[in-house]
């Protein structure tokens, strides 16, 4: 029976498997989940009935590579000096042409243009266009780099350094963050403060979330699947869905508004799951609504050694990912990391589960 492994970086986040497993084919970054599922001979979705009309829906997350964390922007190839040279060329030629036209107007003389003059004039126009284009291109690249550098410097240090990660096995992730009706169906209680069946379950600790996974796994035993919280790498990979932008939907606040409930559009409360647009993997509420517990203890990225292990665990805190209905927009970015003690319960904190094959 195949098993699904946790995500592992190419260089630094390798996880030792209990026994050898065959990697799944890697996603090419462009094909649809349905096309990948067909190529990998896997189901694109899975659904489990919890009774009384309550269902758990999962979507396939392909195996693949991505850059985890906030990368430093690449310096533009064109320099400020080349931009200044281009400006100088364009301005000089413009001045020459303007002087010629003014001289002609003042003297009233008509100049006869020979073929040589015509060629020189054409060359001057070409150089002017070239200079202006180079100047504009340089200006755009320089401004984009400066904006990217300002953004990079403003990010939390624990999102750096960016590092390559390899997801060796495809896995299934909850299409929605866990809901109150799902929690009620499995655990029998509902600790949420903002009660509504389709709202995210909130005010749950990491211990509560793992207890939910354990009990759900008992119910799923006959299906050969078990539930658990995602690793941090699995979560970010699934959230990004092949993107490199601030949010999986883009870089602007308007892009976030289309996919997430956050501080400026939530009205100070969580909302029913699936009310905004999904990412390209088919996952909802990854950048907003409620934060989500991950399996991992918190570790700074720079503390990882070549074997992918670290003794620098920040107490017993567990990783939190995702946006929140209480947060400003930039805090909902795909790379943002949080961590709290595992017994923390907050009204903007829930969880999402993944499925792995039971041994």
Language-model region placement:
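Hydrophobic h-region of N-terminal signal peptides that target proteins for export
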Residues: 8-17, 126-128
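Short, well-ordered surface patches within globular domains
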Residues: 66, 180, 196-257, 293, ...
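Surface-exposed recognition segments
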Residues: 19, 149-166, 243-244, 266-269, ...
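Alpha-helical transmembrane segments
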Residues: 91-106
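Internal/C-terminal transmembrane anchor helices
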Residues: 111, 115-134
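N-terminal pre-domain segments of enzymes
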Residues: 18-51
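Juxtamembrane/start-of-transmembrane alpha-helix segments at the extracytoplasmic/lumenal side
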Residues: 78-89
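A short glycine-rich, aromatic-capped structural motif
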Residues: 48-78, 137-192, 204-207, 287-288, ...
């Amino acid at each position: 029976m195949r098993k699904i492994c946790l995500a592992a970086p190419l260089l630094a986040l390798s996880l030792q498997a209990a026994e050898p497993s065959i990697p799944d084919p890697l996603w090419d970054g462009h094909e649809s989940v349905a096309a990948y599922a067909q190529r990998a001979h896997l189901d694109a979705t899975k659904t489990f009935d919890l009774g009384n009309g309550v269902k758990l829906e999962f979507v396939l997350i392909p195996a693949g590579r991505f850059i985890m964390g906030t990368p430093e922007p690449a310096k533009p190839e064109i320099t400020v000096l080349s931009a200044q040279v281009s400006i100088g060329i364009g301005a000089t030629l413009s001045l020459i042409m303007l002087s010629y036209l003014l001289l002609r107007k003042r003297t009233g003389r008509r100049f006869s243009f020979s073929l040589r003059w015509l060629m020189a004039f054409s060359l001057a126009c070409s150089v002017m266009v070239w200079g202006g284009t180079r100047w504009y291109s340089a200006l755009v690249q320089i401004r984009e780099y400066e904006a990217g550098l300002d953004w990079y410097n403003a990010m939390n240090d624990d999102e750096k350094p960016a590092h390559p990660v390899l997801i060796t096995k495809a896995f299934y992730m909850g299409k929605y963050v866990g809901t109150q009706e799902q929690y009620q169906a499995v655990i029998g209680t509902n600790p949420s403060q903002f009660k509504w069946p389709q709202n995210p379950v909130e005010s749950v600790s990491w211990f509560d979330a793992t207890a939910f996974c354990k009990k759900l796994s008992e119910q799923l035993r006959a299906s050969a699947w078990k539930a658990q919280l995602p690793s941090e790498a699995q979560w970010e990979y699934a959230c990004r869905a092949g993107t490199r932008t601030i949010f999986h939907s883009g870089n602007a606040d308007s892009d976030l508004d289309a996919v997430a409930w956050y501080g400026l559009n939530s009205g100070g409360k969580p909302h029913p799951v699936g009310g905004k647009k999904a990412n390209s993997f088919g996952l909802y509420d990854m950048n907003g609504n409620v934060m989500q517990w991950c399996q991992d203890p918190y570790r700074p990225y720079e503390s990882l050694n070549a074997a992918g292990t670290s003794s620098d665990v920040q107490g017993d805190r567990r990783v939190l990912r995702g946006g929140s209905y209480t947060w400003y927009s930039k805090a909902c970015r795909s790379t943002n990391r949080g961590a709290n003690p595992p017994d923390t319960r907050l009204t903007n904190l829930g969880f999402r589960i993944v499925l792995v094959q039971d041994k």
